[in-house]
Amino acid sequence: MKLSYVTDSLGHLPFEDMLNFAAKLGIDTLEMTTGGWSPAPHLNLDELLQSSEKRKEFSQALEKRNMTLCALNCSGNPLDPGELGKSHRDITDKTMELAGLLGVKKVIMMSGLPAGGPDDKVPNWITYTVSWPPVLKDILNYQWEDVAIPYWKKLVKKAEACGVGKIALENFSSQLVYNPETLFRLRNAVGPMVGLNLDPSHLLWMGADPIIAARELGSAIHHVHGKDVRIERYLSAVNGLLETKEVTDPANRAWNYVAVGCGQDLQWWKEFFSVVKMMGYEGEVSLEMEDLTMSPEAGIRTSVEALKQTISQ
């Protein structure tokens, strides 16, 4: 496996400065965002699609630093029932096209989350037993059978036509696919191009064990994010882990995304990566730095040091 980096946490730096910072840390593989939830600070999707000269300049900036692009990331909500969904679907289609033009074989996404019915206007995340109230069962059936699976069947065909080999869905909250079981429900319906972007931080705060999850996923692991989470023991013991406070208020949250090694110790990370590799994954581990208790640069350095000690080469 190889250390990569999601460049958004250095979004305050211009493209070339970001590349130089990453190169000094020994990172030579990048994952870059194209839009969706991200402002795409280092990549202009429409510009690169429309101009072969701009694509050449972009590629040369990477090549002169001996860097490669391992994946494009268009995470958003393509299943939103309103204008947001329309915009994110357009960005997704364009990302597939740009991946084809750049020779990038992997696209990182989120599954999306539909509304609860054809007349609803906002997404609806069902995470409680469908036994009560009974309408929850109808909502989930609508979301999966009427919205998600038909969309994803079309998107897989689009990706195939563009030369994309893998779509990796992040197991993120407020998405229809948020764990291995929901990933397999979609994968079984649309095919093996769709796999998981295994982000252990989300599984941990949801109460799962990412190491055991990796065993269950096997060849369905299409990508890995190196991101840690810390359960804040005092607040989580009082209120549990269901949390709606802003991420910008870490002192008052029950859990927080933190630099790698500031939540789980290095022995945990060694075992996690060892099992991921044992299950056949040989790809990139993209550092995603979202620790708001320190500067982006400090968090990246802390995480890179931890990941270099623990990734199974």
From Swiss-Prot:
Disulfide bonds: none annotated. Pfam families: AP_endonuc_2. This is Uncharacterized protein YfiH. The gene is yfiH.
